[in-house]
Structures are given as structure tokens and as C-alpha cells.
């Protein structure tokens, strides 16, 4: 019975061990979408601009509070020394009483030259601008994650090609050594094969170093080690048909342009706000007070007021007019920044489009080159085996094929990255991956508001 239990436990343990690698592979596998999402959600740059957005949300709440009444309470008590006519009329030179007073005031805005309206309008625009800055930063960080992800895949493919190249050169060395031992070759061929093998091993070592650098970059950007990465594909329907369509989409949708547009709206509201200084300020002020034992009198006083109060500055040294001119220049500055951003986004989009086209053409050219080199290598190998081709020609053909395959892999991943770079320039990288932007990137997220928040 004991032997049976022991055998059963061993079988279960063996099954668990066999299943563990499969589970581990599934747990460690990461898609491009997951890598970008992790990078955006954990990157402190995104956190920084998101917190700036939340701070401006609170400034918007402060602006909306200007429409609401302001209520203040005041209470005070303490000894009061009095020597006045009232005290003397009572036949005393002076008197000290414990003065007690309390008051409540309510002030309600009636008209302030549209200052509050402009403040709310400005803060809504600033919230919109901050939200687009969050989205812009998310797109940039997402593109960094895409680049680091593709770099790891590219260098892994290059390592595989370099390892195959080393294996081929080892086979060539074994072949010429066997010939030399059989008396059908010479020592020069052996030395040449050894030298080429060393060169192939050196190339492999260099590519492995490049892979480690790419993995280090991935860890910095994504925050996790790149274990099993899945090859991504760009959906065909998300890439515009031509460069001008791409530029138009970028200028319309790029978060870089959108936050500049919002900055212009904020600047316009600033100008309106400064104009409020040319108008009177009108408020309803309600007040009530209770005072006990004041001015030497042992009695209690009650007061209540309901006033409409107007305040109107007549002269401030020309500061108001100068401030209006200042903010008009600020508005013009914001418009110029918008034009600068539009031009920069258009340039980035055209550069990305050109990179995509060039890399696509390179892929086609290099595929033909690889195919031609494979055919050449195969012919040279057959000729070498029957003594019609020298070893050096075959080794050169092997090397040309290795270099062409390495260049093709680089071109393929360069083309893939160029597509994602184009999407990022249009502000649609996250959408193309099926990702929802973080909450702080939504300009409408602050619309729900309560005066008691």
C-alpha cells in the first residue's frame, strides 16, 4: 500500500513539473498591447502630467465657486476698558467689562464684469489642455514602449541568424578538416575556415550584447523583463491611404495640436477676464450681529442689514489697460505656438510617412537580395563539393547571405516601427492597439461637480 502511495505521489509531482513550464510560458508571455499599457500606467512622466490635470480640475472647482454665496461667521470676547461720555454720564471715570460680540455675513455675487464667467471658461480650457498633454505624454511613452518591444524582437531574430551563421561555419570547418585529413585539401583552407568561424563567433557575441542592451531599455521603459514577446502586426485599416491624408488627420487629432488649441481658448478667456476691471462690481450683502457689554454699556445690541453694494475703481494708474494689452499679446503668443505645433506635427507626420515608405521598399529589395544570395550559396556549395569552386568563394557566399538576412530583419522591424510612429504622430497609437486612454486624458472627466465636494 505504501509503495502504491509513493508511486502515486511521484506521478502527481512529475505531472506538475511537466505542466509548470507550460504555465510559466503562458504567464510570462506579453503582447505589444500589454507592454504599452503597463508602460503608460506605471511611467512617472504620465503620472506627473496626470496630477497636473487633477490640480487644474480643482482650479476649475474654485472658479465655479465664485458664483456661490460666501458666508462668514465671527465671534470675539475679551476685556474692554472704557473711558468715554457714556461711562461719565453714569457717574464713573472708567469701567472694564468683558466684551462679547458675534456676527454673520453673506455675500452673493450679482455682477462682476463677467470675471467669474471668464474664470470658468479659462479653467475649462486649461483642463482640456492638461488632458491633451496627458494623452500626448501617453502616446510618447507608448511609442517608447513599442520601440523597446520591437528592438528586443529584432535583436532576438538577429541572434538566431548569427547562431545559424556560426553553425554553418563550423560545418564548413569540419568539412575542410575532413578533406585535409583525407589528403584532398590543404592547411590554408583549414586556417581560412577557422578565421571565418572566429569572425562569425565575434559577430554573434556582438549581437548578443546588442540584445542585452535592448532588454535593459525594455526594462527601463516597461518596468518588466521581456520574457516571451509576441510578434505584433499593424491593422491595415488604421494607416491612412496617402501622406496628405495622414497630415490632415494628424493636425486634426494630434494631442500636441489639441492642447495648443485649448491654450488659445484659455488665452482668449484671460483677455475677457482682464476686461472685467473696466466694469463695476455688484454684490448683495446680508449681515447680522449681536454685541454684549461694549463701549462701557451693560446691555445687548442686535443689528441686521441687507445691502446692495457697488464697488467701482475709477483710477489705478493705467494698470488695468496695460494688463489688458499684456493678455492680448499672450493670446497672440498662444496662437503662434499653435501654428508652430501644427507645422511640427505636419513635419513629423511626413518624416514618419517617408520612413515607412523607405523601409517598406528596403524590405522588398532585401528579400530579393536574400533569395539571390541563398541561390548563389547553394550553387557555390554544390560546385565546392565537386571541386569546381574554392573554399573562399563559398565562405564569401555564406557571409553575404548572413549579412543580407541580418539587414532584412532590421528592415522589417524598422518598417513596423515606422507604422507605429506614424500612428503616434496622429495621436492614435493607443487606439490602434485597442487601449483606452487613462482617465486624466479625458477632457470631460471633470464635468461632474458639486459645490460641496
Regions found by a protein language model. Give the residues of each.
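Gram-negative bacterial Sec-dependent N-terminal signal peptides
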Residues: 2-23
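Bacterial Sec-pathway N-terminal export signals of envelope proteins
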Residues: 24-76, 82, 109-110, 225-265, ...
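Metallo-beta-lactamase
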Residues: 207, 255, 411
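Amphipathic alpha-helical coiled-coil segments
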Residues: 48-63, 137, 141-162, 171, ...
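Periplasmic alpha-helical coiled-coil/stalk elements that build and connect Gram-negative outer-membrane
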Residues: 2-3, 10, 30, 138-249, ...
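Small/polar-residue-enriched beta-strand and adjacent coil segments characteristic
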Residues: 31, 70-84, 89-137, 258-341, ...
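Acidic, low-complexity, intrinsically disordered peripheral segments
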Residues: 2-6, 25-26, 81, 407-453
Amino acid at each position: 500500500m505504501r509503495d502504491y502511495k509513493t508511486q502515486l505521489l511521484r506521478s502527481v509531482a512529475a505531472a506538475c513539473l511537466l505542466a509548470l513550464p507550460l504555465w510559466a510560458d503562458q504567464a510570462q508571455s506579453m503582447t505589444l498591447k500589454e507592454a504599452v499599457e503597463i508602460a503608460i500606467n506605471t511611467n512617472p512622466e504620465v503620472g506627473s502630467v496626470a496630477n497636473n490635470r487633477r490640480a487644474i480640475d480643482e482650479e476649475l472647482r474654485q472658479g465655479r465657486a465664485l458664483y456661490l454665496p460666501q458666508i462668514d461667521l465671527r465671534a470675539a470676547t475679551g476685556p474692554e476698558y472704557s473711558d468715554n461720555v457714556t461711562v461719565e454720564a453714569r457717574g464713573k471715570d472708567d469701567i472694564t467689562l468683558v466684551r462679547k460680540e458675534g456676527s454673520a455675513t453673506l455675500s452673493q455675487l450679482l455682477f462682476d464684469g463677467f470675471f467669474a464667467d471668464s474664470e470658468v471658461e479659462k479653467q475649462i480650457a486649461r483642463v482640456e489642455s492638461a488632458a491633451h498633454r496627458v494623452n500626448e505624454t501617453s502616446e510618447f511613452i507608448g511609442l517608447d514602449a513599442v520601440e523597446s518591444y520591437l528592438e528586443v524582437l529584432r535583436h532576438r531574430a538577429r541572434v538566431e541568424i548569427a547562431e545559424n551563421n556560426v553553425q554553418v561555419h563550423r560545418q564548413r570547418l569540419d568539412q575542410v578538416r575532413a578533406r585535409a585529413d583525407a589528403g584532398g585539401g590543404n592547411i590554408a583552407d583549414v586556417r581560412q575556415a577557422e578565421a571565418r568561424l572566429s569572425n562569425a563567433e565575434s559577430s554573434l557575441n556582438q549581437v548578443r550584447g546588442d540584445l542585452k542592451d535592448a532588454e535593459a531599455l525594455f526594462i527601463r521603459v516597461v518596468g518588466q523583463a521581456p520574457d516571451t514577446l509576441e510578434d505584433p502586426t499593424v491593422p491595415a485599416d488604421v494607416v491612412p491611404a496617402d501622406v496628405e491624408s495622414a497630415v490632415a488627420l494628424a493636425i486634426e487629432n494630434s494631442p500636441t495640436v489639441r492642447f495648443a488649441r485649448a491654450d488659445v481658448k484659455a488665452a482668449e478667456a484671460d483677455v475677457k477676464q482682464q476686461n472685467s476691471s473696466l466694469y463695476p462690481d455688484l454684490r448683495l450683502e446680508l449681515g447680522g450681529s449681536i454685541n454684549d457689554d461694549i463701549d462701557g454699556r451693560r446691555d445687548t445690541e442686535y443689528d441686521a442689514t441687507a445691502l446692495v453694494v457697488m464697488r467701482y475703481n475709477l483710477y489705478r494708474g493705467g494698470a488695468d489697460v496695460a494688463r489688458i494689452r499684456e493678455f492680448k499679446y499672450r493670446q497672440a503668443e498662444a496662437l503662434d505656438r499653435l501654428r508652430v505645433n501644427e507645422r511640427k506635427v505636419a513635419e513629423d507626420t511626413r518624416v514618419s510617412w517617408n520612413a515607412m515608405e523607405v523601409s517598406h521598399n528596403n524590405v522588398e529589395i532585401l528579400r530579393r537580395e536574400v533569395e539571390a544570395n541563398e541561390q548563389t550559396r547553394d550553387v557555390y556549395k554544390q560546385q565546392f563539393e565537386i571541386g569546381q569552386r574554392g573554399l573562399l568563394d563559398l565562405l564569401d557566399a555564406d557571409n553575404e547571405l548572413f549579412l543580407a538576412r541580418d539587414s532584412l530583419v532590421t528592415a522589417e522591424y524598422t518598417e513596423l516601427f515606422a507604422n507605429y510612429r506614424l500612428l503616434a504622430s496622429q495621436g492614435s497609437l493607443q487606439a490602434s492597439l485597442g487601449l483606452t486612454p487613462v482617465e486624466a486624458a479625458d477632457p470631460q472627466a471633470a464635468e461632474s461637480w458639486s459645490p460641496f465636494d
